[in-house]
C-alpha cells in the first residue's frame, strides 16, 4: 500500500451550520467518528496488503466486512461534508443554486414540497442506523430516493446528496426528535454541490470523485 486515506478538511468552520447543527456535533462527528473510520480503513487496507503478500485467502475474506464498513463510512462522510453549506449562505437556496436539479425534481415529484415530504418520510422510516440519498441514474438524469444500511455506500447510481441518520449526527442536539433534524437539514443542504453532482452524473458516467 503506497498511501493512506486521510481525514478531509471541512469546507467551512465547525460552527458554520449553527443553529441547525451545533459546533459540538460537527467537531465530534468529524474529528472522532469520521477519523475512526479513516483509521480503521487504513488498518484494514494494511491487513489486506499483508494477506495478499502471503497469499492468505482466509485472511483476505475475513477483512472484507471491515473494508466495506469503514471504507463506506469514509466515502459517505466525505460526501456528506460537501453536501452541507453554511447556514443562510447562497448555496442553500435551491432555486438560485440548482435550477437544473430543481426542474428535474419538479418533473418527477410534481413540486419541491412533494419531494421534500417524500424524502423526509424515507429518512424517518430508516430502522436503526443508515443513510438517505437522492441519486441520479446517470445520463438519463432519472432521480430516485434510496437508503443504505449502516455505512454501506451508494453503488451504481450517482449520489446527488445524502443525509446521515446515525444518532451521532443529531442526538446531542435533537435527542430523540429525529423529525426536527430531518425537517431542519434542508436549511444547510448545499444545492450548489448537488447541482454539480447531478449535472456531472448526467453528462458522464464513471466513479465519483471525492
UniProtKB/Swiss-Prot annotation:
Enzyme category, top tier: oxidoreductase
Keyword Oxidoreductase in record: yes
Pfam families: Sod_Fe_C, Sod_Fe_N
Keywords from the UniProt entry: Manganese, Metal-binding, Mitochondrion, Oxidoreductase, Transit peptide
EC id: 1.15.1.1
Reactions catalysed, as given in the entry: 2 superoxide + 2 H(+) = H2O2 + O2
GO MF term set: manganese ion binding; superoxide dismutase activity
Main subcellular location of this protein, as a coarse class: mitochondrion
Role, per record: Destroys superoxide anion radicals which are normally produced within the cells and which are toxic to biological systems.
Family: Belongs to the iron/manganese superoxide dismutase family.
Name of this protein: Superoxide dismutase [Mn], mitochondrial
Amino acid at each position: 500500500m503506497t498511501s493512506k486515506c486521510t481525514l478531509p478538511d471541512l469546507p467551512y468552520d465547525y460552527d458554520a451550520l449553527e443553529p441547525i447543527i451545533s459546533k459540538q456535533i460537527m467537531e465530534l462527528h468529524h474529528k472522532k467518528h469520521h477519523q475512526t473510520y479513516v483509521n480503521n480503513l487504513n488498518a484494514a487496507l494494511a491487513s489486506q496488503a499483508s494477506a495478499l503478500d502471503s497469499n492468505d485467502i482466509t485472511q483476505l475474506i475475513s477483512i472484507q466486512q471491515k473494508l466495506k464498513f469503514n471504507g463506506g463510512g469514509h466515502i459517505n462522510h466525505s460526501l456528506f461534508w460537501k453536501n452541507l453549506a453554511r447556514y443562510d449562505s447562497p448555496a442553500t437556496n435551491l432555486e438560485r443554486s440548482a435550477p437544473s436539479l430543481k426542474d428535474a425534481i419538479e418533473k418527477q415529484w410534481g413540486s419541491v414540497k412533494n419531494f421534500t415530504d417524500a424524502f423526509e418520510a424515507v429518512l424517518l422510516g430508516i430502522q436503526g442506523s443508515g443513510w438517505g440519498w437522492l441519486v441520479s441514474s446517470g445520463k438519463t438524469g432519472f432521480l430516485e430516493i434510496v437508503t443504505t444500511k449502516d455505512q454501506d455506500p451508494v453503488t451504481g447510481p450517482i449520489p446527488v446528496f445524502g443525509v446521515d441518520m446515525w444518532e451521532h449526527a443529531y442526538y446531542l442536539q435533537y435527542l430523540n426528535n429525529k423529525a426536527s433534524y430531518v425537517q431542519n437539514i434542508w436549511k444547510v443542504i448545499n444545492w450548489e454541490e448537488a447541482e454539480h453532482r447531478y449535472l456531472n452524473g448526467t453528462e458522464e458516467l464513471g466513479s465519483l470523485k471525492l
